[in-house]
Amino acid sequence: IQSTNMDQQGSLTEDSMNSFIRTLIQAGIWKNKVPKQTARAKDDTQTTVKKTEAEADAVASKEARLGFQPIVSVDAELLRQQRRFSSPRVLLSENTPLEPPPLYLTEQPVALNRTSRRKREGKSHRGEYSVCDSESRWVTDKSSAVDIRGHQVTVLGEIRMGPS
């Protein structure tokens, strides 16, 4: 951690305290998590540097008065709070889509050029593309198919969710 600037009287300025807080948060260091830094003196004795701890305690007492709760580490809970994820091909979201995919041929116009990816007609979302280029329509009259490993599988016409 780099040392912070001090004004002429020896007290921390507000800007330097803010930058120090940011440095602590970015480094994942706060209150009890401040490591004791040791420095070797020329005569091979170790001296504990307590300046960082004193500055952290001063900032912590000020922030406690303001009701500030620092973020110590980034964990899975913080990542779960993100509602939108980034993908170049599709929009990933925890929410269900506004409209279901078309189930019948009449609901979706047949594309003339099957090799190009095109956005769905009508109301669409950013990055919403067809998953498969080789098939441009929904197949609803199949009872069996071949999976990607070459095995024969049964196609379900309806999937029931919840208690039966």
Curated annotation (Swiss-Prot):
It is found in: Secreted. Glycans are attached at residue 113. Its main location: secreted. Residues 4-120 form a propeptide. InterPro entries: Cystine-knot_cytokine (IPR029034), Nerve_growth_factor-like (IPR020408), Nerve_growth_factor-rel (IPR002072), Neurotrophin-3 (IPR015578), NTF3_N (IPR045815). Seems to promote the survival of visceral and proprioceptive sensory neurons. This is Neurotrophin-3.
